């Protein structure tokens, strides 16, 4: 899954004067027992399309999933359970709209208001999704302090409840920084937290280290590793994202 910082880093660049379209493809692997004693593994391969026009950014993410011993899905979301040892197929599609309230011209502060809708395109009978719509509202903020850029996210997610479950609607937050470490290369770290989704569950707590390298004007690549510190987070995770701007 793409970490929270991925969307923030995309907004650090200078706003384009005209409309722009970009795509990305990623590959993410995560592993953990999530407090069950049985190890679950997730391969997550998202294809992303993003269109920017003025202060607005529109994005759609369509992923492919492969889950071993399904317990949780991408982003630590709970799954129905009761499926085979290995399931794979289309994941849930996520769309988002982002309004840049501040573009950096006011004191160097970037402030984005973001709304997301998760469409239940994954097969819940294969434990690849819940079969319900989810909704997210969040605020992203970033500011440069010399060569270091600090960033943060604060948001709230509304889960669609399954007939035999009652999910809580959690608040989540992220805090991190990024800085140049070489020519066309940026590195940083972020800490992500989210309230528990079920009463018997745990909060998400995880640390991400990342590096982004600009290959050319049109291409860049991002590598990251994640360490979880709770039963709701993976024991270990890593991945890469390749971006292309048209």
Language-model features: locations:
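Cleavable N-terminal export/targeting peptides
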Residues: 1-20
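Transmembrane beta-barrel domains of Gram-negative outer membranes and organellar outer membranes
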Residues: 16-162, 170-246
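Active-site cleft segment of glycoside hydrolase catalytic domains centered on the general acid/base Glu
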Residues: 165
């Amino acid at each position: 899954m793409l970490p929270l910082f991925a969307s923030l880093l995309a907004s650090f660049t200078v706003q384009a004067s005209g409309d722009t379209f970009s795509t990305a493809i990623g590959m993410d692997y995560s592993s953990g027992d999530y407090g069950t004693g049985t190890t679950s593994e997730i391969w997550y391969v998202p294809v992303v399309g993003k269109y920017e026009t003025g202060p607005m950014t529109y994005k759609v993410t369509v992923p492919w999933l492969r889950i071993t011993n399904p317990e949780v899905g991408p982003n630590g979301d709970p799954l129905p359970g009761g499926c085979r040892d290995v399931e794979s197929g289309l994941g849930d599609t996520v769309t988002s709209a982002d309004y840049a309230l501040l573009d950096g011209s006011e004191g160097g502060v970037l402030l984005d208001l973001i709304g997301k809708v998760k469409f239940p395109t994954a097969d819940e009978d294969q434990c690849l999704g819940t079969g319900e719509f989810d909704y997210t509202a969040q605020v992203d903020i970033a500011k440069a302090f010399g060569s270091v850029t600090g960033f943060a996210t604060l948001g709230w997610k509304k889960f669609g409840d399954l007939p035999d479950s009652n999910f809580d609607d959690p608040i989540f937050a992220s805090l991190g920084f990024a800085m140049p470490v070489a020519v066309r290369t940026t590195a940083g770290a972020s800490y992500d937290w989210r309230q528990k989704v079920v009463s018997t569950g745990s909060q998400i707590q995880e640390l991400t280290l990342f590096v982004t390298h600009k290959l050319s004007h049109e291409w860049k690549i991002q590598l990251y590793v994640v360490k979880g510190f709770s039963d709701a987070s993976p024991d270990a995770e890593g991945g890469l994202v390749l971006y292309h701007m048209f």
